[in-house]
């Protein structure tokens, strides 16, 4: 029996500066997967037929929505669900957030938000609520 799921750390970059986070050094300083690196990973996932769930994390993966959508829309040859771990900053622009969700809602299985007592100083709760309300 193979693995049922896997995670892709898309980027080390993040727009929040949460003090407790290992990625708190600032926005432009970390590695982001190139499209070539990402395709190599996705092709390997395609060769692993037991994987039916991919978690996309970072840093903040939604700094790179085109790469996130590349993961979502890759041809795995089977149904693969996607989860996204985000701070929700992209909910500030409700129209862009709505368009992203509408384009991808059939494949996104879960969006989890980084928000708690440690994050709230750096993350606007309203942005998260905007996404949840879509």
Model-based region annotation:
Residues 25-33, 50-64, 79-93, 105-128:
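Core AdoMet radical
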Residues 1-36, 48:
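Canonical Radical SAM [4Fe-4S] cluster-binding loop centered on the CxxxCxxC motif
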Residues 38, 67-68, 97, 128:
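Aromatic/hydrophobic pocket-lining residues that form the small-molecule binding cavity
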Residues 11, 61-64, 68:
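Generic structural signal for well-ordered secondary structure
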Residues 44-48, 71-77, 99-108, 131-133:
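Acidic (Asp/Glu)-rich catalytic clusters
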Residues 4, 93-102:
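Alpha-helical scaffolding within the catalytic cores
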């Amino acid at each position: 029996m193979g693995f049922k799921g896997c995670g892709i750390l898309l980027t080390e970059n993040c727009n929040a500066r949460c003090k407790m986070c290992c990625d708190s050094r600032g926005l432009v300083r970390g590695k982001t997967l190139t499209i070539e690196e990402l395709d190599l990973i996705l092709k390997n996932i395609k060769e692993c037929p037991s994987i039916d769930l991919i978690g996309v994390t970072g840093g903040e993966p939604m700094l790179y929505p085109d790469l996130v959508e590349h993961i979502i829309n890759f041809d795995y040859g089977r149904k693969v669900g996607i989860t996204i771990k985000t701070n929700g900053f992209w909910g500030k622009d409700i129209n862009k957030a709505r368009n992203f969700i509408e384009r991808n809602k059939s494949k996104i299985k879960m969006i989890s938000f980084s928000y708690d007592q440690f994050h709230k100083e750096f993350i606007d709760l309203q942005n998260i609520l905007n996404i949840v309300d879509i």
